[in-house]
Amino acid sequence: MPLAQLKEPWPLMELVPLDPENGQASGEEAGLQPSKDEGILKEISITHHVKAGSEKADPSHFELLKVLGQGSFGKVFLVRKVTRPDNGHLYAMKVLKKATLKVRDRVRTKMERDILADVNHPFVVKLHYAFQTEGKLYLILDFLRGGDLFTRLSKEVMFTEEDVKFYLAELALGLDHLHSLGIIYRDLKPENILLDEEGHIKLTDFGLSKEAIDHEKKAYSFCGTVEYMAPEVVNRQGHTHSADWWSYGVLMFEMLTGSLPFQGKDRKETMTLILKAKLGMPQFLSTEAQSLLRALFKRNPANRLGSGPDGAEEIKRHIFYSTIDWNKLYRREIKPPFKPAVAQPDDTFYFDTEFTSRTPRDSPGIPPSAGAHQLFRGFSFVATGLMEDDSKPRATQAPLHSVVQQLHGKNLVFSDGYIVKETIGVGSYSVCKRCVHKATNMEYAVKVIDKSKRDPSEEIEILLRYGQHPNIITLKDVYDDSKHVYLVTELMRGGELLDKILRQKFFSEREASFVLYTISKTVEYLHSQGVVHRDLKPSNILYVDESGNPECLRICDFGFAKQLRAENGLLMTPCYTANFVAPEVLKRQGYDEGCDIWSLGVLLYTMLAGYTPFANGPSDTPEEILTRISSGKFTLSGGNWNTVSETAKDLVSKMLHVDPHQRLTAKQVLQHPWITQKDKLPQSQLSHQDLQLVKGGMAATYSALSSSKPTPQLKPIESSILAQRRVRKLPSTTL
């Protein structure tokens, strides 16, 4: 976005002449003293410790599942451990060929392993194993399912300053920890900040990190991504941990504005801009954000915030972070603004399909030079926690088999993995069938969606992001054959909610309260995340088993569901929604939420009365039903209503209010006495009409509603202007 150009906001440093060949500052001009041996192997001091008696790992201990990424140094695979004590656990495996690494790159790799082995912090990726073969080096790291911050920043979400503050605060704690160990990160950029499944950050890729080596604790290497480089890194005058705080400022600027502060047409021009350009401060930023940026963008590193004796404490004390509770943040008790859409432990939907579509293959390494193994001597490492008593309970591990596949770029077809059985249900644009997974003989349901009639991307994303909720149907697998999309979900063996209730010989008001509580709690969770279902008819609320326990209810069929988005198609965080959304957008969102509550009101009425509120019989026309709905006319007397509690009638009336903006919210439903005091409700039996009459009336009600309004067609988020502008292509190399 265009930035308002102001007068010179930051002081300038004297510009160091650039080498015309490569755009880099020459060593002598930059104050870098040449070394007679070029300092290649002496660039860092490598220290190494391995726990005595620990069992070493090797490549045979890991099953290759998918390619997650590929860069100049090697590939990253998703792997599953197949040996004890952590068999079944998923990791990211970074594989590097010794023969293709230059000496300097080998030092970087050894350095990355040493740094990761020494660092244990909630916001830094954890190293679990490190080992080598004759031709390759292996780093076994946390598998972080949320992908990298760059993908989130560029393709999906509208962040506010409060949202950015969360990520920057976690990042400050991670950097502070590295600095306390004498480590300069030097490659801070969104691509190296990963998200876990909850949305917390993890710093990764330590190939350019460096432990300070001279008496002034300065490093001199020219490294990092040029747009994020500090001036002292560009001119090679020697840099300390203060260089990371400049990069931190660049990241903050990019997240707040969507653009980089210094970016030329090529590398040389970018470095020139970093050293001498005037930059206008965007006036739409808060004064606190502007103040922090000015304090970080000091070209003299000695004057930069964070460079003083207190280090990161200077950053943490800045007024921009006045609302952050740093202790709660460190304990991961502050809720992230964005939750990645990942469901199963080995989902890789958020990794570039250029890589995840490839067959994972760890090719034999070419034997390196004779000295290579000596250079990497002592490379093996086993995380301490893995050697503890295996009898102790551990966190839930991934199952030994996986049915989750990648959505795009596969050469797989649904019938390769599943046997299709009978039809369960038919809709206007999809059909649902029972299916059996061939490898495990497990039963599932598959929803086959005709892509020419509906774009399923929103439904898939919502199920991935929120399907972990205990009362939302779980998405197990996704296939795409260009004409149809196949959504494999858990099988609802207990059938529809109304079928179960109306077939019971005994159903009471108290039981109805427990049912509504479970469903309302789930709807309140969705609404709090900016998601509206918009099709909460009873046939989309099913039991996962035949127990009839309300906790076994699942909300299904998110085909009409929506996530709250900005005009450019990007998702809005709750903070963004609360502060920056136009009233008409909020009004529409409130209307959709009101429709969900109305549907729950219809369900509640039917459970209590034994018949539907607006359809009186098979002879009703859609026009008659719509007239009753629009006038808000329904009866609360006679039949079961003579014995139903007054609090129940009050709740029904407030949920079925004719004005959607005057209906109770899901949160208010949960706070209603009929829900909070359910144990005091009557347990007398409620009578009901014939099951088919009730279901017929319900079907007629929703049929009349659907015929009265057109269904909006939602476009995929990839079609948004901002998403298209920020699409990038990662470099491809062969390992």
UniProtKB/Swiss-Prot annotation:
> According to the UniProt entry, which residues carry Phosphoserine?
54, 221, 307, 363, 369, 380, 732
Stretches that traverse the bilayer: none
Active-site residue list: 187 (proton acceptor), 535 (proton acceptor)
GO MF term set: ATP binding; DNA-binding transcription factor binding; kinase activity; magnesium ion binding; protein serine kinase activity; protein serine/threonine kinase activity; protein serine/threonine/tyrosine kinase activity; ribosomal protein S6 kinase activity
The AGC-kinase C-terminal domain is annotated at 322-391
Q: Which organism is it from?
A: Rattus norvegicus (Rat)
Family, similarity comment:
Belongs to the protein kinase superfamily. AGC Ser/Thr protein kinase family. S6 kinase subfamily.
The entry's protein name is: Ribosomal protein S6 kinase alpha-1
Q: Where in the cell is it found?
A: Nucleus; Cytoplasm
- CDD domains found in the cross-reference section: STKc_RSK1_C (cd14175), STKc_RSK_N (cd05582)
Positions of post-translational Phosphothreonine modification: 359, 573
GO BP, sorted A to Z = hepatocyte proliferation; negative regulation of apoptotic process; negative regulation of TOR signaling; positive regulation of DNA-templated transcription; positive regulation of hepatic stellate cell activation; positive regulation of transcription by RNA polymerase II; TORC1 signaling
Principal localization reads nucleus
Q: Which cofactor does it need?
A: Mg(2+)
Q: Per the database entry, which stretches of residues form a coiled coil? A: none
Q: What is the lineage of its organism?
A: Eukaryota, Metazoa, Chordata, Craniata, Vertebrata
Q: What is its EC number?
A: 2.7.11.1
Q: What are the record's GO terms for cellular component?
A: cytoplasm; cytosol; glutamatergic synapse; nucleoplasm; postsynaptic density; spindle; synapse
Posttranslational mods? Activated by phosphorylation at Ser-221 by PDPK1. Autophosphorylated on Ser-380, as part of the activation process. May be phosphorylated at Thr-359 and Ser-363 by MAPK1/ERK2 and MAPK3/ERK1.
Tell me the gene name: Rps6ka1
> What does the UniProt keyword field contain?
ATP-binding, Cytoplasm, Kinase, Nucleotide-binding, Nucleus, Phosphoprotein, Repeat, Serine/threonine-protein kinase, Transferase
Q: What function does the entry list?
A: Serine/threonine-protein kinase that acts downstream of ERK (MAPK1/ERK2 and MAPK3/ERK1) signaling and mediates mitogenic and stress-induced activation of the transcription factors CREB1, ETV1/ER81 and NR4A1/NUR77, regulates translation through RPS6 and EIF4B phosphorylation, and mediates cellular proliferation, survival, and differentiation by modulating mTOR signaling and repressing pro-apoptotic function of BAD and DAPK1. In fibroblast, is required for EGF-stimulated phosphorylation of CREB1, which results in the subsequent transcriptional activation of several immediate-early genes.
**Residues annotated to bind ATP:** 68-76, 94, 424-432, 447
Q: Anything known on activity regulation?
A: Upon extracellular signal or mitogen stimulation, phosphorylated at Thr-573 in the C-terminal kinase domain (CTKD) by MAPK1/ERK2 and MAPK3/ERK1. The activated CTKD then autophosphorylates Ser-380, allowing binding of PDPK1, which in turn phosphorylates Ser-221 in the N-terminal kinase domain (NTDK) leading to the full activation of the protein and subsequent phosphorylation of the substrates by the NTKD.
Under the subunit heading, UniProt states: Forms a complex with either MAPK1/ERK2 or MAPK3/ERK1 in quiescent cells. Transiently dissociates following mitogenic stimulation. Interacts with ETV1/ER81 and FGFR1.
Q: Which residues form the Protein kinase domain?
A: 62-321, 418-675
